[in-house]
Amino acid sequence: MRFYSILSAVATLLLSSLPLHAADWLALPEQAPAPADNPTTAEKVELGKALFFDPRFSSTGTVSCNSCHNVMLGGEDNRPVSMGIHGKTGGRNSPTVWNSGFSASQFWDGRSPSLEDQAKGPVANLVEMGMADVETAMDRVRSIPGYKPLFEAAFGKDSMTVDNAARAVAAFERTLVTPNSPYDRYVKGEKTALNQQQIRGMNTFASVGCTSCHSGAAFNGPQMPEGNGFFMKFPTFADNAYVKKYDLLADRGRADVTGKEADAYFFKVPTLRNIALTAPYFHNGRVDTLDEAVKVMAKTQLNIELDKAQTEDMVAFLKALTGEFPEITMPRLPATEGWHIETE
């Protein structure tokens, strides 16, 4: 994989020599794009929100989508790795659900091409929600009378299917957008939205090469067609103390999905939006603080060491990516009638 190391180093040198232009910095749109076969409607969002918050579709009745992707927080659970049924823990850090509609693929390894596909995964995961399969989970949905009118309002008659449930959850997730951060206001022309330290951090972010991966409005790479995620090798430069300290070579990333050795240690480039709220960091959740994460990235991805001032400036800039969160209220879930959850 020496080719990728050389490519990254060349990209860094090229980027550091380029002037910064206002056109290189993009504000986050107010709405996430929706696919043609699943346009966002208020009815889908209402249904999807209920499904997202409902723990009854886990085998124990205790774990919902919101358990690991808490929209009352930064869209994750602030754990190194998420906790599922019976206190089981997974192997990766929970990505934020906020602004996930701007990602061309889902999961750290990009194994799902869309939010609709991703929504079907956790319910049948033995660690996360623990149902035997997605149809068993859907049978739970069908057994709750109050869900039928919600499905009919969103999709019409005889519409209580796995695919429609996934479409509804995805529609709700696409409303989870946090625009109008200080950074967004700055690039739109409000030049007092960032202070001088944040502006220095913004310039350092670009000049040292961070934008070779974290570009675009969501800071997760170039805009890609849905299903074609943007992946980078992590760590690119593995011969440093951080790699051992934080066990960064234990997870082979996308190679576990494709079976290709060339994909070893490649991961989806995550958004940096609201990153100050989503600790701990990286796919294994081993790094606790944002300043340490910045140092790790500089060394493992760019093979440079930032000084104290550069690190502090960049952290200040990254904190300026925290946007405005829409008000989220807990939904009133349809009542369970005539049955109870059989726990294992």
Model features per residue range: what roles?
Residues M1-S8:
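Bacterial N-terminal signal peptides that target proteins for export
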